[in-house]
Design a protein with these regions (language model features):
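Structural and coupling elements of P-loop NTPases
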Residues: 1-517
Length: 517
């Protein structure tokens, strides 16, 4: 297979949703139908002690939530698939935003009963701003929920994008038995079993007037389906690949990830429609995947994927050229040359050494602290710099200190490693050695930080909430003593040794900015 053929078969996408819409369960079922796993272990399956493959961190297994981005790779029907399962919890939206910088399309999971929710709306806007094509999977249709036409209206009213159902549920609300593929005009009836979604479902397929289909669902249901399809054909939008690519139209699919209903038809159609690796913008201009010079960027740092060794993995999206094990690259931010000798690919914590990888692929690099989120690696002869990632100012602050001074070394090591992941901001106070000030977007980030220090570094810590809600930086080298009106501010220093002013509220932050133009 030529390099160009390898690039064309890549599909790299993220799955986004509001918490509890079923994002991680859908990820798991795509792995099941893709042949990457043989039994799905949903976070709901407590009795059998199986957990989602993508939820690999211990706290995720205990709480049944995703707080990290997982990278999952497998082959299916000639495609090399890279799925990035993102944190569902709103407190970890920054990790999700960074992950979206590394994908070529996104799958938006919507709960049939709730429609478009707040977090979905935020993540949709990020995709829209970046021009990422969005595919919609309406989940949980084995439960009572909104009418499919109402969901189409909801997507347009809330998100401002038209939808084009690629399939349509067969049955009555809350009791759907199959889906109708509008392109092939085939009905797919799913035979329910008692396996609770851990195995593939048996499917009966046929035309709408086939005897086998009529006997399974009944003539009345099929008559209602015909009415819906007629209305769709008259009033709905036809599929338009150009509009999908521009983010003006979202292909829409129906199913239930928990029971495997509609998962395989979605996967196969998605791979047919989803974009190949796209061109990327750099400060020097646009680079194409087929360009021969190697380039990539770091979009995520993860400490302790192997807690026994306290390792640190930097996840890189390859953008151009061919990656080969042992390649020597320029680290654009430091100007140093780095040899990438231990590249890995992942199915959550399971790893495989990479000999070769192509644009669209996500690989993990063992890192000793040289790489950071947003960094560029490239060939020295063809230097490029990828555009900076968005930064989210923290809104909650706390003082973090070890319970025992005997654990100070482990404490410093743990805080340093976890801070490099980017979910928590760490600040130092002048002349204060025994504690740090930490900032986060949400409370759960504090809880996860505390949990991981205690369980991965064996350091019990104290977290003291502080009454600050805003952080501000100055432009240029202005010393704190020259600023007017910082009496209510706490002055701390970030990892680049820049002064940061923590303030009680946004009003005082605005007032400080006015007094110091």
């Amino acid at each position: 297979m030529t390099d160009l053929e390898e690039i064309k078969r890549r599909r790299t996408f993220a799955i986004i949703s509001h918490p509890d819409a079923g994002k991680t369960t859908l990820t798991e079922k795509l792995l099941l139908y893709g042949g990457a796993i043989h039994l799905a272990g949903s976070v709901k399956a407590r009795k059998t002690a199986r957990y989602a493959v993508s939820d690999w961190m211990e706290i995720e297994k205990q709480r049944g939530i995703s707080v990290t981005s997982s990278v999952l790779q497998f082959d299916y029907q000639g495609c090399r698939i890279n799925i990035l399962d993102t944190p569902g919890h709103a407190d970890f939206s920054e990790d999700t935003y960074r992950t979206l910088m590394a994908v070529d399309s996104a799958v938006m999971v919507i709960d049939v009963a709730k429609g478009v929710e707040a977090q979905t709306k935020k993540l949709f806007k990020v995709c829209s701003d970046r021009g990422i094509p969005i595919f919609t999977f309406v989940n949980k249709i084995d439960h009572f929920g909104k009418n499919p036409f109402d969901l189409m209206a909801d997507i347009e009213d809330v998100l401002g994008i038209r939808s084009c159902p690629m399939n349509w549920p067969i049955g009555v609300n809350g009791d759907y038995t199959g889906i109708y593929d509008r392109e092939t005009e085939m009905c797919h009836i799913f035979i329910k079993d008692n396996a609770h979604g851990v195995k593939k479902l048996e499917v009966i397929s046929g035309k709408i007037d086939d005897e086998a289909i009529v006997s399974q669902v009944g003539q009345e249901v099929l008559d209602a389906l015909r009415d819906d399809l007629e209305l769709l054909d008259e009033a709905g939008d036809p599929f338009d690949a150009e509009k999908v690519a521009k983010g003006e139209l979202t292909p829409m699919f129906f199913g239930s990830a928990m029971t495997n209903f509609g998962v395989q038809p979605f996967l196969e159609k998605y791979l047919e429609l989803a974009p190949q690796p796209e061109a990327r913008k750099t400060l020097e201009g646009t680079i194409e995947p087929k360009d021969p010079a190697f380039s990539g960027f770091i979009f995520k740092i993860q400490a302790n994927m192997d807690p026994k060794h306290h390792d640190r993995v930097a996840f890189m999206r390859i953008c151009s050229g061919v990656f080969e094990k042992g390649i020597t690259v320029l680290h654009r931010q430091s100007g140093k040359m780095l040899r990438l000798s231990q590249p890995q690919q992942f199915l959550a914590t399971e790893r495989q050494t990479v000999e070769k990888a192509y644009p669209g692929d996500i690989i993990g690099l063992f890192d000793t602290g040289e790489l950071g989120v947003g960094d560029t690696v490239c060939e020295k002869k063809h230097p490029v710099t990828f555009i900076d990632f968005p930064v989210f100012p923290p809104e909650l602050f706390a003082r973090l200190s070890p319970e025992s001074s005997m654990k100070r070394k482990q404490f410093l090591n743990g805080v340093s490693q976890l801070a490099q992941e980017g979910a928590i901001q760490v600040y130092k106070q002048p002349y204060v050695m025994e504690s740090f000030i930490i900032g986060a977007v949400g409370q759960l980030q504090f809880e996860v930080m505390k949990y991981r220090l205690e369980n991965e570094y064996n350091v019990h810590v104290n977290l003291e909430p502080l009454s600050y809600t805003a952080a501000r930086w100055t432009e240029g080298d202005i010393p704190p003593e020259e600023l007017i009106g910082i009496d209510n501010a706490m002055v701390v220093y970030d990892r680049r040794e820049r002064p940061v002013y923590l303030l009680p509220n946004a009003w005082q932050a605005g007032w400080l900015a006015q007094r110091n133009p």
